[in-house]
Amino acid sequence: MASFPFSPSFMFDFELTRILGSASSGGCEVGEFKSAVGKIKKHDAESWHAAWKEQGERAESIANEAAAAGFRIPARNAYLRASNYFRASAYMFTNSEPRVVPLSERSIANFERAAGLMDGEVMFVEIPYEEGITLTGWLCLPPKEARVEGKKPLILYAGGADATKEELYFLYGHTGPQLGYAVLCLEGPGQGMLLKKSKIPLRPDFEVVAGYVLDYFSSLAKSRPDLELDLDRIAVAGAATGGYFALRAATDARIKACVAVDPFFSMWELALTRAPQSFMKLWENGWVMDNVLDTFTDAHCRGNFQAGWEMSLGKSSMGVEKSSAMLRRFKDFSLENKKDGKILERVTCPVFLTGPGNGSEMYSSADDSTLKIKDMLKKVPADKKEIWLPSDVADGGLTAKIGAWALLAQKTFLFLDKQFEVKRKAL
C-alpha cells in the first residue's frame, strides 16, 4: 500500500522513516525531523550529513542544559536523540570517510550520558572474543517496578549490517526492560566500531559469536547473582541480517526462543535479485572474468548512489576490496551450505519469524526468505512457529519493520511471554 514519501529517493525515504520510527522510544523529535528533512537533497550525502549533524548538536545542547538544571528525563531524552542524530549524520558516508569514526564516537558518548539517566540500570559490557578482540554491548536491565515473577529473562539482540548497539536500544532495549526483560544490545564482528574503526568483518557462523556471549553471561550470572539473570530463559533476536544471525545463534541449545525479523535465507541469492541474472550466471560459471565483473559493477555504482553505497558497505563488511570477492563471500552467509549443511534443522527452540509482506522493497521478501525458512525449520513444532507477514507500512510492511517498531515490540513480547510463561494481569 502506498505511503507518503519524505524524499524522492527511495533509499533516503527508507532511512528517514527509520529515524522517525524511533520517535516513540525517544530517538527522534518531529520538529527536529522536519527541520532536517527540509535541508536534505536527493542522493546528496553531504546535505544528509549536515542536516543530521546540526540536529545532533542541537539535541546535545538541549541535553546539556537540562542536565545542568537537574532535569533527568528531559536530559535523557535529548541525549538519546543526539545519539541517534549523530549516528544518522554518518550513515550515507562510506566507512572510508574520515568523519565516520568521530561522528560514531560522538553518538556513543551521548548514549552513554543517556544510559546513566535511565529508569533501570544500563551496563556497558565487554565480552572476550578471539585474538584479543572484545565485543561490546549495552545490557539494559528492568527497573524494580517492572520486574516479573522470578529471575529476569534475557534477550541477546544482534544488529545487522549497518545498525549500532546504540540504535538497537530504540526497539527492544527500550521496551524490554519496561516489561521485565534484560536486553543486551550487542555489536558483533563487522558491526559498529568493530567494523568502522577496527576493520573487523562480519562472519557467517554467528553461532560462534553467540557462544562467546552466552559463555560471558554464564560467568556474569555467577559473579553477579544480584543481577538475577535467568539463564534458562534466554532468547535471541535480530532484524534483516540480524535476523539471519539470530537463526544461526538459535542452533545453540542454550537459546530457548528466537525472534528473526525479516531475515534472508541466503545473502548470495538475495544479491542475485539485485543484479542482471544472465550476467551473474555467466560470471558464476566462469564465462565472465572477475575483472570484467568488477569493472561493470564499479561503472554501475558511479552512476547509482544506492548501488554505490551498498557495494561499499558490502565490501567493507566482507573485508574485501573487489566486488567479485564480496559476492563469493556472500555465499558463506546462508542457512544451507556445503560446510555447515542444513543449519535450520539444528534449530529446535520456538521461533517468531516475520517477513515484509510488501515484497522485496529493500532487502528481502516473504516468498524468497520467510516462507522458505518456515518450511525448513523442521525440528520446530508447528505450534512453536509464529509467522507475521504484514503488508501495510503502518503494520510493519517495510523491511526490518521500519516505521512500526512499537508494534513489532508488542508482538515480540507477546510471543516471548508465551514461551517463557510470563504471567501478567490484564489492565
Curated annotation (Swiss-Prot):
Domain of life according to the entry: Eukaryota
Keyword field contains Hydrolase: yes
Enzyme Commission designation: 3.7.1.-
Disulfide bonds: none
Keywords, ordered alphabetically: Hydrolase, Virulence
UniProt xrefs under PANTHER family: ALPHA_BETA HYDROLASE PSOB (PTHR22946:SF13), DIENELACTONE HYDROLASE DOMAIN-CONTAINING PROTEIN-RELATED (PTHR22946)
Protein known as: Alpha/beta hydrolase gkaG
GO BP annotations, alphabetical order: antibiotic biosynthetic process; monocarboxylic acid biosynthetic process
Active-site residues (renumbered): D368
Biological classification of the source: Eukaryota, Fungi, Dikarya, Ascomycota, Pezizomycotina
InterPro entries, per the entry: AB_hydrolase_fold (IPR029058), FrsA-like (IPR010520), FrsA_esterase (IPR050261)
Protein biosynthesis as UniProt keyword: no
